[in-house]
Amino acid sequence: MDKIDRKIISLLQENARYPLKYLAQKVFLSSPAVSTRIERLEKNGIITGYHATVDPVALGYHITAFINLTLDPKQKDEFYPYVTACPNVLECNCVTGLYSIMLKVAFPSTMELDTFIGHLQQYGNTQTQIVFSTAVPPRGIHLPQEEEEEETAQNQ
């Protein structure tokens, strides 16, 4: 992966709907060359998909929460299909610490969140944090360009 690939990835993370012509202008290549690079990045599993970013509140999902869960490893085969089928689960991560699972969920109301937590508790103890506000929304991975890498190396 070179600096052009990193620039293409950064641009696509900014807006996955940028036209090829715009991307090509930004990286000083032809549209077919950019298309070939994007296809290679997809084939290599670096670009894994394209998604619309939506406002959950505008869609009626006023409650975002993080739920920690203690899960016995023997329950994983039963738990993973269950949680995968729950449309309100935005993320499910295996984590270190007192709890083994961290879920990010969105619900229209605290009553629906409470019902979901009740179902989760068949798998283990939970701890829930409701989000009041988000200072840094989900964003892409920052890929330093060569100039930044050189600057960092010089400052060390």
Spans of model-derived segments:
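A compositional/biophysical signature of low hydrophobicity enriched in polar/charged and small residues
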Residues: 1-156
